[in-house]
Amino acid sequence: MTQHTQTPSMPSPLWQYWRGLSGWNFYFLVKFGLLWAGYLNFHPLLNLVFMAFLLMPIPKYRLHRLRHWIAIPVGFALFWHDTWLPGPQSIMSQGTQVAEFSSGYLLDLIARFINWQMIGAIFVLLVAWLFLSQWIRVTVFVVAIMVWLNVLTLTGPVFTLWPAGQPTDTVTTTGGNAAATVATAGDKPVIGDMPAQTAPPTTANLNAWLNTFYAAEEKRKTTFPAQLPPDAQPFDLLVINICSLSWSDVEAAGLMSHPLWSHFDILFKHFNSGTSYSGPAAIRLLRASCGQPSHTRLYQPANNECYLFDNLAKLGFTQHLMMDHNGEFGGFLKEVRENGGMQSELMNQSGLPTALLSFDGSPVYDDLAVLNRWLTGEEREANSRSATFFNLLPLHDGNHFPGVSKTADYKIRAQKLFDELDAFFTELEKSGRKVMVVVVPEHGGALKGDRMQISGLRDIPSPSITNVPAGVKFFGMKAPHEGAPIDINQPSSYLAISELVVRAVDGKLFTEDSVNWNKLTSNLPQTAPVSENANAVVIQYQGKPYVRLNGGDWVPYPQ
């Protein structure tokens, strides 16, 4: 009888279980394409780790399939993390406000996210991958590209993954007519009101520069007089705070040549709103008498000398508050009172005609009617001083005409608002009242989207959103300004507005035979373009914009 000895089977070498990326090849190819087009804030190391997780050989086929199921939510989260879309913190913080949007507005926002050209390009990529994968091991090329992208992060402190030669339409922060002051914040030089930008734009250097900026801003303020001189002339100050209006929006709407702009005495060409949301913008304006604080500091008590309207109240200016809306959305009115220091009663809105319905369905009143009510009310208080804060909402995204669910065309609304302001200016000129009108938009409406954000999305305060058309006009002057407006081309912000108010606060320029406009507008405080929301910061450094999301690394803002 023959005995057969059975030798135990040897386990297969681990290398036999390398299965490639399979369908995940397409996932990474889509990312590479979006990265090249500038649509991603790509994180090379995280993606390399995810790829290694997918490639790791697993002998048991069931565990291999389970890995793919686990990878689906991980891959989705990583893809979201690699985009410029709002993060979980931002979505949660804005969630209650989004819930108040009308259904029509929500559908409109969803439709804007659909990019048919991008969908077409992804479809072509899918067909190409399916076709070529019959003969080519695509995994090899995908892994090679991923390794190359990670190597790039090690070749230097700063690099860009976007195609070279992209233009920037930013402002170079040069001195112009500003005072050539030199101060220090710690051991960092601050030249011409702004920290020097000499170091290379690494994350460490940009963080250090931003800290220097805020340290320098803490020391800046405009000083109001303790009292007005006996020969001071009473006048009214009207501050008009317009939501969703930037120079980019004006240009996109084709309204750069509207007569309203020639009506101003002073126009700021590079005024930075510092944020892209209404509440923070209003707080910054109401605290205009001090330097620019960080977003977090906005919701902490400020020095009493920072509140513009309180400074005016100490000099005898009666405070007034007007809105063309109820101020309830997002707790706007509450923020204005608690953080902006505006405690005046809201002007009576009864009987005002409704011009629009807001994105949350609440009424937006006719602005000319609101302004005329203010003018009528102030006429009953002749020879007095007043300071009025007027916040208006007609240009906000999602506003629609009564009875129509579709968002009203921005240009139609902007044309109407500009016509109304122009007509109001004409009426003020006829009235002969001494009035200083200051127009400071909150932020832009993002009428034109970019590679980071679709039209209407303002989670990231990009330069096109925060560069707003601020202007000043004096009425009732004995020697009014003639000719084209005086352009302020230096980078400016709210401190410059407070400085202009201080220079005019005694009202003497209304009765002077000749006004020294050069003295009035020269050496206004400059402010470096720094814009911030809760989860995003955008700065201009060495003439180029950089963005930091959720406290991460700085990257060039894609143009």
Curated annotation (Swiss-Prot):
Its main location: membrane. The keyword Transmembrane applies. This is Cellulose biosynthesis protein BcsG. Keywords: Cell membrane, Cellulose biosynthesis, Membrane, Transmembrane, Transmembrane helix. It is a multi-pass membrane protein. The keyword Cell membrane applies. Required for cellulose biosynthesis. GO terms for cellular component: plasma membrane. One of its GO terms (biological process) is cellulose biosynthetic process. The gene is bcsG. Pfam families: CBP_BcsG. It is found in: Cell membrane. The chain crosses the membrane at residues 34-54, 68-88, 113-133, 139-159. NCBIfam families: cellulose_yhjU (TIGR03368).
